[in-house]
Amino acid sequence: MQTDYKLIRQVIEGLSMMNNKFMNLMLNENVSAAQIMLRVILKDDKIKVKNVRIQRFIQNIYGHSAQLDILAEDGFGRYFNVEVQRSDEGASVRRARFYSSVLDTQFLQANRDYNELPDSYIIFITENDVFKKGLPLYSVERVIKEESSDFSDGSYIVYVNSNCRDNTALGRLMQDLYCTEPAKLHYKEFAERMEFLKCSKEGEEKMTDIIELYAQNVAEQAAKETVHKKSVEVALSLLADGMSIDFAAKHSKLTVEEVRRLAEKRTT
């Protein structure tokens, strides 16, 4: 199936960083963009990202494996995993806990002392306010409950509520995550990359996977429409032969309500 190039351009122009695949392309090997994102979210201007990778697959031969959307490392050897979660289910607190454990097992090599375990940050940027408290950030650390003191094990989980898009540094960052136009982005580190991806031939070529996924979705939708059209024809034929609505629904694979609407249209 040939996809209309104009439609593809519309898809590309409508992409924002809240799209996982596009976010990955925006940050892949883009140290400056990853760095500004982490500095703003963690309120730490001293973070200096050394490298950033996307779609890092970490295999566990004895249990559940994980594919990390964005994984960055800074000059202190700390690891930062950033995930965009569009659904509340994807932002499960136990998923965050699991991802934290994945980083621990991956980056403490055999025969090394436990004190050499690097600090890790799991950052979930959520489309919804999953905790429903209206806060822009939910920072999670272990504490000793009896004396309300930090446990200080170097493990951090942060939920970022992307609904909070005010005029603070974090709010402007969240605005950028939803923005589709390079010229309207607040942070130049994102603007330069988006300009490249959306407005250059080379950048467009890097979005092959997104374009192919779009074409696949179009093809699947067309196939569904073809099947539905055939089902409607079967139902109308059965109704014309005097069959009941229930009978027509059963043999056309349409719902009873759909067939009832078809029957009503026939009589008007």
Residue ranges and their predicted role:
Residues 144-153, 158-163, 173, 177-180:
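Low-complexity, glycine/alanine/valine/leucine- and proline-rich hydrophobic stretches
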Residues 124-127, 161-162, 198:
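Pocket-edge structural micro-motifs
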Residues 1-18, 73, 80-85, 171-268:
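Short, charged alpha-helical interaction segments and adjacent helix-coil junctions
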Residues 1-153, 166-168, 221:
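Accessory alpha/beta interaction modules
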